[in-house]
Curated annotation (Swiss-Prot):
Function noted in UniProt: Capsid protein VP2 self assembles to form an icosahedral capsid with a T=13 symmetry, about 70 nm in diameter, and consisting of 260 VP2 trimers. The capsid encapsulates the genomic dsRNA. VP2 is also involved in attachment and entry into the host cell.
Name of the featured protein: Structural polyprotein
Annotated organism of origin: Infectious pancreatic necrosis virus (strain N1) (IPNV)
SUPFAM superfamilies: Positive stranded ssRNA viruses (SSF88633)
Pfam families: Birna_VP2, Birna_VP3, Birna_VP4
Domain Peptidase S50 stretches: 509-734
EC number: 3.4.21.-
Binding site for a divalent metal cation: D26
Site (Cleavage): A442, W443, A486, A487, A495, A496, A508, S509, R715, A716, A734, S735
Superkingdom classification of source: Viruses
Keyword Magnesium in annotation: no
GO term, biological process aspect, one: proteolysis
Annotated Polar residues bias: 963-972
PTM info: Specific enzymatic cleavages yield mature proteins. The capsid assembly seems to be regulated by polyprotein processing. The protease VP4 cleaves itself off the polyprotein, thus releasing pre-VP2 and VP3 within the infected cell. During capsid assembly, the C-terminus of pre-VP2 is further processed by VP4, giving rise to VP2, the external capsid protein and three small peptides that all stay closely associated with the capsid.
């Protein structure tokens, strides 16, 4: 993990392999290079239009899959080709291990003369091997697993599926890639030697019983001894000993041929055959042995092997009746080992992608990317820089914990390609520790990821604290407006598996002929919640926005927008960064999806999604997923802002449509939805709508006043009269208005202005309380049954009293609560064994350091009360073997013919031994000691200090070096 950028690079490479490789941060710190390999195949569809792709997403070598086609009548498979990386890794690298891999499988190419692509895809990940799959038909593929994260069904071939390699474990070894070793000049032409993939081989043994061989029907006809499943994709070594005896002396020399056939999925034609022959004669018929010893290179395995068959035949008719009995000279076995067969990912798990009903001769495209840690061969190593792997427990544990919660986070091995692309932003957030996870919140994952961060990477979580979100109660913005708030506060509309697509595809309502209309605008995937608090603007206007859903045209919800002077495109989501212009190029506005039909004031404005207006005038705006604002209410707001509003932001929401004469406000529909959005922050809606009988659910008193026409915005003659009404409503003291209208307006703006009517204020609070607790329907039904409120009055005449403060729990319950609390803290720290019962037995104490260390090392539950002091490193104050310290100190301080080390240097060496628990210094400490010795030697000597005397050096014993050759003047 790169702590400078606070990015979990290993996890990012797993989730988004196309971003490049990243070293696996485990404790294998071998030198390596990072290598990314691509795979690209255009597979031609057969006449049947059906086939299957066998993918090995975790294979550490170059072979990543195979392609089969169904025959014309779909009764049998036909092998087409292997799927491999673009470079054969064993040509340049000796060792390697896989970091991550991804495939994209889809069709977008038509054969000549056709105009439509047909066909669907089914994909499933199977935890077993290929030979264990019972049926490979299109329909039966979905029965391989019940895990929804591991299968996709009936996906159009034009949409495609994505196969993602999720590690099944993190103890990945470096495997030999079957590279060829350098050969001598005298080697036979074509002869070569390779290092086989022999790490964790998968070994199969065929044990034959000590019984008579089944009789053959005729000479030269094979009789089966054993047939079964086996999975092989790499080089294989075969060994065997089949011994038997004949009941009678053979009349003629009889040849026994024992044949081991390796076969694939598609037919009974052997891929590789191993044969062992032996002659039974008069001399050996009491004990005949056929030996099998053969190596099969990877090149000879031309397709995946899933079956083996052992059989035999004879060449003499007279020997058919001569009974042969196995096991005369010992066990009869045939074994074969597949290289790297038990390395995770080589043979299991597999992902099967079946296609059906595709257009014959169309093209199925397979595009993959694989990331490796590789060690180059000696020739390549001369020109490449290798680097040590770095152990990063935080990065590794973070990846482990994220992937262990794959069900909760909906991380899959197979995806619909469009869904995988939707998750790209979320994956980038999860791997970025400096991110506050705004998109992850939209998917309902933020709490899980934050909890994992606190446990797996507490240091980085401290260095890069999450920005305190302003959202909190802001969940009401979407949750309340769409009526989808969950009981826990998270809105269902953005939950994984909920109506997130409807919300993400929402559009601001507007004219279909606008240049940024829904039909023309190309949506960007976005669900990024960011909130910014701005100081009070010089002026502004608030307008409602009605969002419609593309997939459900009848559904809609509302929100608010504030239009202020200035250019603030950085505060808009990517979908809203649209610049429109007033008529005759007299100004512009960001965030409006259509040009303004009237002239402006040569200024630039920005329409921002509004979250809240605070008491001090500050405004809180947010980035949301909707598209640019469109519609007549936005045009009305701009007209007011350009022509009438000179200072401040009116605490109300304006709606209406400007007529063609630009002097009249005509009625507009959708006021009920807009009222809900306006009353959420406590603002009244000022506007006009056709009809006065519509009822608005869950709104404040202002909605009723608007619907009944109490706050009119009627047709008027001339813009001055029109502006007169709106301008007076905007003023803090609306002089000139009707006295009754002024009183009603002030009462309904109790939350936006100072409270002037206590009864209306209580009524508004009561309505908010009823809505908050979801009692509106119940209260309405009660009002119909009890119109005079007789029963209800008796029920609520006496409000509930707070009971007396209860006494504290007794000692038993207090100890149980304490044990539960200690257990929760211990489990969060990683001590899963610390149940409340265990804590109680441990004298109501959490795990000690020794107990926790014992659990980490052995994986077993420690005994309560046992401190396991042997598992705690005991500090050693000072070693007792001072002779060892003095020898090392003299050796480090100087050569034998130099002066001995001073006492201060002895103390420094002793401190190192004490720090290391009795062990000697490591490389860094040795370097520090040498530097200390050089500093001590450079100290100026006092004239009065006598020079230390030392014994004269002993002369070297006579004799010659053992490296000097014999002779007088010989050269070395």
């Amino acid at each position: 993990m790169n702590t400078n950028k606070a990015t979990a690079t290993y996890l990012k490479s797993i989730m988004l392999p196309e971003t490049g490789p990243a070293s696996i941060p485990d404790d294998i710190t071998e030198r390596h290079i990072l290598k990314q390999e691509t795979s690209s195949y255009n597979l031609e569809v057969s006449e049947s239009g059906s086939g299957i792709l066998v993918c090995f997403p975790g294979a550490p070598g170059s072979r990543i899959g195979a392609h089969y086609r169904w025959n014309a009548n779909q009764t049998g498979l036909e092998f087409d080709q292997w799927l491999e990386t673009s470079q054969d890794l064993k040509k340049a690298f000796n060792y390697g291990r896989l970091i991550s891999r991804k495939y994209d499988i889809q069709s977008s190419t038509l054969p000549a003369g056709l105009y439509a692509l047909n066909g669907t895809l089914n994909a499933a990940t199977f935890e077993g091997s290929l030979s264990e799959v019972e049926s490979l038909t299109y329909n039966s593929l979905m029965s391989l697993t019940t895990n929804p994260q591991d299968k996709v069904n009936n996906q159009l071939v034009t949409k495609g599926v994505t196969v993602l390699n999720l590690p099944t474990g993190f103890d990945k070894p470096y495997v030999r890639l079957e590279d060829e070793t350098p050969q001598g000049l005298q080697s036979m032409n074509g002869a070569k030697m390779r290092c086989t993939a022999a790490i964790a081989p998968r070994r199969y043994e065929i044990d034959l019983p000590s019984q008579r061989l089944p009789p053959v029907p005729a000479t030269g006809t094979l009789t089966t001894l054993y047939e079964g499943n086996a999975d092989i994709v790499n080089s294989t070594t075969v060994t065997g000993d089949i011994n038997f005896s004949l009941a009678e002396q053979p009349a003629n020399e009889t040849k026994f041929d024992f044949q081991l056939d390796f076969m694939g999925l598609d037919n009974d034609v052997p891929v590789v055959t191993v044969v062992s022959s032996v002659l039974a004669t008069n001399d050996n018929y009491r004990g005949v042995s056929a030996k099998m010893t053969q190596s099969i290179p990877t090149e000879n395995i031309t397709k995946p092997i899933t079956r083996v068959k052992l059989s035999y035949k004879i060449n003499q008719q007279t020997a058919i009746g001569n009974v042969a009995t196995l096991g005369t000279m010992g066990p009869t076995t045939v074994s074969f080992s597949s290289g790297n067969g038990n390395v995770p990912g080589v043979l299991r798990p597999i992902t099967l992608v079946a296609y059906e009903k595709m257009t014959p001769l169309s093209i199925l495209t397979v595009a993959g990317v694989s990331n490796y840690e590789s060690y180059p061969n000696p020739e390549l190593l001369k020109n490449m820089v290798t680097r040590y792997g770095k152990y990063d427990p935080e990065g590794l544990n973070y990846a482990k914990m994220i992937l262990s919660h794959r069900e909760e986070l909906d991380i899959r091995t197979v995806w619909r390609t469009e869904e995988y692309k939707e998750r790209t932003r979320v994956f980038n957030e999860i791997t970025d520790f400096s991110s506050d996870l705004p998109t992850s919140k939209a998917w309902g994952w933020r709490d899980i990821v934050r909890g994992i961060r606190k446990v797996a990477a507490p240091v980085l979580s401290t260095l890069f604290p999450m920005a305190a979100p302003l959202i909190g109660m802001a969940d009401q913005f979407i949750g309340d407006l769409t009526k989808t708030n969950a009981a826990g506060g998270r809105y269902h509309s953005m939950a994984a598996g909920g109506r997130h697509k409807d919300v993400l595809e929402s559009w601001a309502s507007g004219g279909p002929d606008g240049k940024f209309s829904r039909a023309l605008k190309n949506r960007l995937e976005s669900a990024n919640y960011e909130e910014v608090e701005l100081p009070p603007p010089s002026k502004g206007v608030i307008v409602p926005v009605v969002h419609t859903v593309k997939s459900a045209p009848g559904e809609a919800f509302g929100s608010l927008a504030i239009i202020i002077p200035g250019e603030y495109p950085e505060l808009l989501d990517a979908n809203q960064q649209v610049l429109s212009h007033f008529a005759n190029d007299t100004g512009s506005v960001w965030g409006i999806g259509e040009d303004i039909p009237f002239e402006g004031d040569n200024m630039c404005y920005t329409a921002l999604p509004l979250k809240e207006i605070k008491r001090n005038g500050n405004i809180v705006v947010e980035k949301i997923f909707a598209g640019p604002i469109m519609g007549p209410s936005a045009q009305l707001g701009l007209s007011l802002l350009v022509n009438d509003i000179e200072d401040g932001v009116p605490r109300m929401v304006f709606t209406g449509e400007i007529a063609d004469d630009e002097e009249t406000i005509i009625p507009i529909c959708g006021v009920d939805i807009k009222a809900i959005a306006a009353h959420e922050p406590g603002l009244p809606l000022i506007g006009n709508q056709p009809g006065v009988d519509e009822e608005v659910r869950n709104t404040s008193l202002a909605a009723h006043l608007i619907q009944t026409g109490t706050l009119p915005v009627q047709r008027a003659k001339g813009s001055n009269k029109r502006i007169k009404y709106l301008g007076e409503l905007m003023a803090s003291n609306a002089s000139g208005m009707d006295e009754e209208l002024q009183r009603l307006l002030n009462a309904t703006m109790a939350r936006a202005k100072e409270v002037q009517d206590a009864e209306i204020y209580k009524l508004l609070k009561l309505m908010a309380w009823t809505r908050k607790n979801d009692l509106t329907d119940h209260m309405y039904e009660w009002s119909k049954e009890d119109p005079d409120a007789l029963k209800f009055g008796k029920l609520i005449s006496t409000p509930p009293k707070h009971p007396e403060k209860p006494k504290g729990p007794d000692q038993h319950h207090a100890q149980e609560a304490r044990a539960t609390r200690i257990s929760l803290d211990a489990v969060r720290a990683g001590a899963d064994f610390a149940t409340p019962e265990w804590v109680a037995l441990n004298n109501y104490r959490g795990p000690s350091p020794g107990q926790f260390k014992y659990y980490l090392i052995t994986g077993r539950e420690p005994e309560p009360g046992d401190e396991y002091e042997d598992y705690i490193k005991q500090p050693i104050v000072k070693p007792t073997d001072m002779n060892k310290i003095r020898r090392l100190a003299n050796s480090v301080y100087g050569l034998p013919h130099q002066e001995p080390a001073p006492e201060e240097f002895y103390d420094a060496v002793a401190a190192v031994f004490a720090q290391n628990g009795g062990r000697g210094p490591d490389q860094d400490q040795m370097q520090d000691l040498r530097e200390l010795a050089r500093q001590m030697k450079r100290r100026p000597r006092n004239a009065d200090a006598p020079r230390r005397t030392r014994a004269p050096a002993e002369p070297a014993p006579p004799g010659r070096s053992r490296f000097t050759p014999s002779g007088d003047n010989a050269e070395v």
